[in-house]
Swiss-Prot record:
GO cellular component: cytoplasm
Source taxon at top rank: Archaea
Organism this protein belongs to: Pyrococcus furiosus (strain ATCC 43587 / DSM 3638 / JCM 8422 / Vc1)
InterPro entries, per the entry: DUF167, YggU-like_sf
Protein name listed in UniProt: UPF0235 protein PF1765
Amino acid sequence: MLRETSEGVILSVIVAPNARETKIVGIDGTRGRVKVNVAAPPVKGKANKELMKFFKKLFGAEVVIVRGETSREKDLLIKGITKKEVIEKLEL
């Protein structure tokens, strides 16, 4: 779910688009991913943009999708942050 790199932390998520609001809804134990509802449709990158905006606001850091651009399962790189900081912000 979390891997520290020289650039920051890789966070594995599973996305549910077209939700009422964008929020973290739990942990998918089987997949080892954070479950995130996204209040945007999966059309023309809208859900991806909303997802990155949400995590940028949460962590106060740049966020990029490093894997899963067109999939519900994504790996996000949160730049310039430690694994400990991510755990604290996610309240894991």
